[in-house]
């Protein structure tokens, strides 16, 4: 054994005495590579072995090491620019990652995203964002988006971005989960995901108004019918408000108002101060619905002068103003002789 073995001021020293065999002996010690050293630059460690005998030359064995980056580790997340897209709308996905280890290196990062059923990739929408190195591979094939990066030695965020279109055939209000796989080949793969919930398209209302008699006599009753429907397939009318102010010369027939058509029925149907009001919500079909009411032509209405009855049918985006015209006539006379 050495008669002396110590470390002082960064120098390892050992001393042996009277070795008379041919067996190998070693001293062993450990060092830690500092974070501050230059990556890829050789460090040579030279020892000096000398024997206290002028016939033995000094021996200076060396060993080299080349410091490398630490193994990196990824952090990932996935975002979508619209969590509640309408049928037929385009949305944008963003898959982002970064190395979380200072002085670490991600030798390879692979990203894969299988586009779920109900979504359709938008051609040429795939792109990468972030500092160099750019991805060595970035493509979409058969509904799968893939990217590959190599030799990332910083901690900056990089992203791949692509767009999809929500198919008209998907089920409204049923969540679609899009999950990516981001693999740094050293640690268990990350699986960031994001959820969207498809919504109906915006509906658009079409309206018309009819009267059952265009030339009523003074004192007669006539029936008005205001009809409307959604004209957009897979569209939704969230709210429809109908208002009809009964013109001068006409008088509402009490209790005559009613609604016709499939559910949903109107939440509100009333007549107040000569105004007929109806309100519908959440219409998702394209069927026709109507409100119907009667008026009586007043005796003092001017014969032969047109009375225009205009309604407002408002879907909060594209209001319509259907109208119907009547021309009051004299009552039938009766002769007395």
Predicted regions and their residues:
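Exported/extracytosolic protein signature
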Residues: 1-337
